[in-house]
Amino acid sequence: MKIIRAKDYYDMSRKAANIISAQIIMKPNCVLGLATGSTPIGAYEQLVAWYEKGDLDFSQVTTINLDEYKGIPKEDSHSYYYFMNEKLFDKVNIRKENTYIPDGMEPDSAVACQNYDHIIHKLGGVDLQLLGLGHNGHIGFNEPGIAFEKETYCVNLSERTIKANMRFFAEEKDVPRQAYTMGIKSIMSAQKILVVVSGSDKAEIVKTAFFGPITPAVPASVLQLHNDVTVVADEAALSLLPD
């Protein structure tokens, strides 16, 4: 595992975007695994800026998103489909038919998960997987206690994750309780993994996940077993680690 220290959120975002852009330049038809949430937004903004300058071409890129809320239409502003289009896809020349996000409106969980696994396998896997890091160590929506052998599945979100997502909704009752997510096995099958972390509130979980024991109680700890993981984190998130 390689850890890159960034000065602040802006620096973290730029360093992460550099890694993603290098992947696109080296392999124009690459498969990128993408994440949502607040942490990756800065990296997406930087990628858009480089695209607008003519430095990046997304026309051959394929994307696979980690997760989607169950029961929310993709046109809803709270859906991850909406998020990805707003933050990235609508601003670059990626072909929409090459962007994949779990179908949150598929009522049959088994069908939704099987369909998504089929897409991932058909594409030959992910070249570079982008991840955020939850306060409880979740990656994607893989909550503490989840088995490492899972591929795509329907998850009941933890109370902590629901509370963390409340800031995006008008009321707590509106926050979805379930989501479709790529499992740990799917994430770990990526050729390369990039984790972005920012803020002093993530310092404890950075130390626990990346320097503590490997355990399902801390899903992100499994990343210690992957042979090509880069963590880009700002100084606040790394504040509990030795220099």
How should each PLM-predicted stretch be described?
Residues 1-32:
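N-terminal glycine-/serine-/threonine-rich phosphate-binding loop
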Residues 26-52:
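Glycine-rich N-terminal segment of FAD-binding domains in flavoprotein oxidoreductases
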Residues 33-37, 65, 102-103, 130-133, ...:
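Short beta-strand segments
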Residues 38-39, 69, 133-138, 144, ...:
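Short glycine-rich anion-binding loops that position phosphate/pyrophosphate groups of nucleotides
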Residues 45-57, 80, 144-153, 212-214:
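A glycine- and small-aliphatic-rich helix-loop capping segment at beta-alpha/alpha-beta transitions
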Residues 56-129:
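Ligand-binding beta-strand-loop-alpha-helix segment within the catalytic cores
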Residues 136, 140-184:
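Class I SAM-dependent methyltransferase SAM-binding "motif I" and its flanking Rossmann-like core
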Residues 185, 189-243:
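ATP/nucleoside-binding phosphotransfer catalytic cores, i.e., glycine-rich phosphate-binding loops
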